[in-house]
């Protein structure tokens, strides 16, 4: 749980996402309210529920990125799902309860990784002992062990092939699990038999370098209490979990359509108790969804937010509209953000010892072409920049190993040379860009 103020949260989001001030403020307040709730006394804390958010805006404007960055800031369990993947209970497909089960699975992995860090020093020592034992034998003298330990730390043994016993992670009984049943608190035959045959090990040959992470994770897991990991992960999900439901507009039954799609409306009805607050059975234990923050998003090109079930609209009280991105926004995305594509391509080409310099005119030309193709073909927002950049660098990326030591300046002329003809031809850009 982070104690950042709303202003600090927005400032952090500004490093990666251009514009969309309203959406940033809404999620910043929602996250800060989590911290405020923690400060309350027990009698009122359970009465304070998160205000779920509905983001409305075209594709590629930052809806998903805002939620993903928010979860990283909060160090909270996060899951992104598409509403279109789910079907009403009773139909073939996934039911919405699997959202919470997937969120718990993600939280278990995150919690275990974080707890491994706490015991890392002891785990590294134990992993080193196993490597030394595999090289020098169990009966080696202490002096010999210390000699090998020194070589190991200096990396002199990294290429040495050793044979070690590691846990056998394959589960031959997995086929006994009906799809999803093991997740539902029902009898999980695969897990029962897996435990019966559990503790199995297998001997594997690998280099010392390859064995490091495998053995360290095994030794760390021996030092962790599985029940503590589960309890911590479940608490994190219930108190801090964030679920991002994309494409919510695709499960709207439009008011102007005759005979509404039963399954679409059914998905909305199944989402109601989940967002309102219910208890979902998972293989790690029951999870209450009352205090999980749900952020739904959709483009709403055809359907309208009012086409959602009235009950679902009421459970998404905060609405923010994200505007379409302009050419000026694209210039800022390419030059100001911490994860700008220009920086990424510079770093990629640097591995081939090719220097890249972007001029201001070059960045403006890239932004101009992306905006023009969005206008003339289909507006996919900032994602268009990926296509444009890949096209501009296609030739250089292919020949980079042969151009080691060169310096390349990406200016307006360079962009025109690599992309101009494609951008001008509407027919070509429709298929290529």
Curated annotation (Swiss-Prot):
Q: Which residues form a coiled coil?
A: none
Task: Quote the subcellular location field of this record.
Answer: Cytoplasm
Tell me the GO molecular function terms.
ATP binding; ATP hydrolysis activity; peptidase activity; proteasome-activating activity
Share what the entry says about its subunit structure, partners included.
Answer: A double ring-shaped homohexamer of HslV is capped on each side by a ring-shaped HslU homohexamer. The assembly of the HslU/HslV complex is dependent on binding of ATP.
GO cellular component terms, A-Z: HslUV protease complex
Where is this protein primarily located? cytoplasm
* Functional description taken from the UniProt entry: ATPase subunit of a proteasome-like degradation complex; this subunit has chaperone activity. The binding of ATP and its subsequent hydrolysis by HslU are essential for unfolding of protein substrates subsequently hydrolyzed by HslV. HslU recognizes the N-terminal part of its protein substrates and unfolds these before they are guided to HslV for hydrolysis.
Give TM regions: none
Keywords in alphabetical order: ATP-binding, Chaperone, Cytoplasm, Nucleotide-binding, Stress response
A Gene Ontology BP annotation from the UniProt entry: protein unfolding
Q: Identify the SMART domains for this entry.
A: AAA, ClpB_D2-small
Q: Which PANTHER family match?
A: ATP-DEPENDENT CLP PROTEASE ATP-BINDING SUBUNIT CLPX-LIKE, MITOCHONDRIAL-RELATED, ATP-DEPENDENT PROTEASE ATPASE SUBUNIT HSLU
Protein name as it appears in the record:
ATP-dependent protease ATPase subunit HslU
The UniProt family comment states: Belongs to the ClpX chaperone family. HslU subfamily.
Chain residues that bind ATP: 18, 60-65, 246, 311, 383
């Amino acid at each position: 749980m982070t104690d950042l103020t709303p202003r600090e949260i927005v400032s952090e989001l500004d490093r990666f996402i251009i514009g969309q001030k309203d959406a940033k403020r809404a999620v910043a307040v929602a996250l800060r309210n989590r911290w405020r709730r923690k400060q309350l006394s027990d009698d009122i804390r359970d009465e304070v529920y998160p205000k779920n958010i509905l983001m409305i805006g075209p594709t590629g404007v930052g809806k998903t990125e805002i939620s993903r960055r928010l979860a990283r800031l909060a160090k909270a369990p996060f899951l992104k799902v598409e509403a279109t993947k789910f079907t009403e209970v009773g139909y073939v497909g996934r039911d919405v309860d699997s959202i919470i089960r997937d969120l718990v699975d993600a939280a278990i992995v995150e919690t275990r990784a974080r707890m491994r860090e706490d015991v890392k020093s002891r785990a590294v020592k134990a992993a080193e002992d196993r490597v030394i034992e595999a090289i020098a034998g169990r009966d080696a003298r202490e002096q010999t062990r210390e000699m090998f330990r020194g070589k190991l730390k200096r990396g002199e043994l990294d290429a040495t092939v050793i044979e070690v016993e590691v846990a056998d992670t394959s589960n031959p009984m997995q086929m006994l699990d009906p799809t999803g049943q093991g997740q539902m608190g029902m009898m999980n035959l695969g897990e029962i038999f897996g435990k019966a045959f559990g503790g199995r090990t297998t001997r594997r040959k690998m280099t010392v370098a390859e064995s490091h992470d495998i053995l360290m994770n095994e030794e760390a897991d021996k030092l962790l209490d599985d029940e503590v990991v589960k309890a911590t992960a479940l608490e994190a999900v219930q108190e801090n979990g964030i679920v991002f439901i994309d494409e919510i507009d695709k499960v709207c039954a439009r008011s102007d359509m005759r005979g509404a799609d039963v399954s679409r409306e059914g998905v909305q009805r199944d989402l109601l108790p989940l967002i309102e607050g219910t208890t979902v059975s998972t293989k790690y234990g029951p999870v209450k969804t009352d205090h999980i923050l749900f952020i739904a998003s959709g483009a709403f090109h055809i359907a309208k937010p009012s086409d959602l079930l009235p009950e679902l609209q009421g459970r998404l009280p905060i609405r923010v509209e994200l505007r379409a991105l302009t050419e000026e926004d694209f210039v800022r995305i390419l030059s100001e953000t911490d994860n700008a594509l220009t920086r990424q391509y510079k770093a990629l080409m640097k591995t081939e010892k090719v220097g890249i310099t972007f001029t201001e005119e070059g960045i403006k030309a890239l932004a101009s072409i992306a905006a023009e193709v969005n206008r003339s073909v289909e507006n996919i927002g900032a994602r268009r920049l990926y296509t444009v950049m890949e096209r501009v660098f296609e030739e250089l990326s292919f020949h980079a190993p042969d151009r080691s030591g060169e310096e390349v300046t990406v200016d307006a002329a360079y962009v025109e040379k690599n992309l101009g003809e494609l951008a001008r031809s509407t027919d070509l850009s429709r298929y290529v860009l």
